[in-house]
Amino acid sequence: MGMVVSLQTVVSMVHDDPGFYNPATYLITGPLILIWLLIALRSRFSKERMWLALAVISALSLLPVYHRIYDAKLLLLSIPACAMLWAEGGLIAWLALAINLLALLFTSDLPWVFFSIMLSHLRPTLPWLSGPILNAIVALPAPTMLLLMSIFYLWIYVRRSSNAAEPARMIDKIASAR
């Protein structure tokens, strides 16, 4: 369990049954992948959207299926999107930097050695946390950070795609027609 970065490791701490954690993982990641795919297919090409799309899928592709920690080197593909957001400045730039740094830290080889040693001494339930979901987030930060990174970059990607404003315009037209 210690060297696997897929979301199944987190969900299995809630209920350790493949009949539960596999479908639960697909229900979490499936809609995110579908949104990414729809935006990628419907948006006009631009370098900005290309880097954002790559940042999303580099993290998101690790979550639904079995991956080891060394597969997380794919996260290096998110650095250009982070640099692009950093150059723009503001709160989004700081969020991108923090999320990228934490995701890269939690999936790096040396910090993971520390986490695996810590995990071997960790009790199944932490007394200061309530519930298996919080235990999983603390015990397995890599998949949790990958999910956070995926959602963050997907949010930016959707907001900046040319078709993202279309549903909002349609809702405005419907509301003004009444």
Cite the ranges covered by each PLM segment:
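Hydrophobic/aromatic-rich transmembrane helices and adjacent perimembrane loops
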Residues: 68-85
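Hydrophobic membrane-targeting alpha-helices
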Residues: 36-40, 63, 82-86, 153-157
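Aromatic-enriched
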Residues: 86-178
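Residue-level detector of solvent-exposed, low-hydrophobicity positions
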Residues: 14, 33, 43, 77, ...
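Primarily membrane-embedded glycan-assembly and transfer machineries that use lipid-linked glycans
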Residues: 1-52, 58-69, 130-133, 137, ...
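Residue-level signal for alpha-helical context at structural boundaries
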Residues: 29, 78, 92-93
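Lipid-exposed faces of alpha-helical membrane segments in multi-pass integral membrane proteins
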Residues: 27-35, 56-60, 75, 99-105, ...
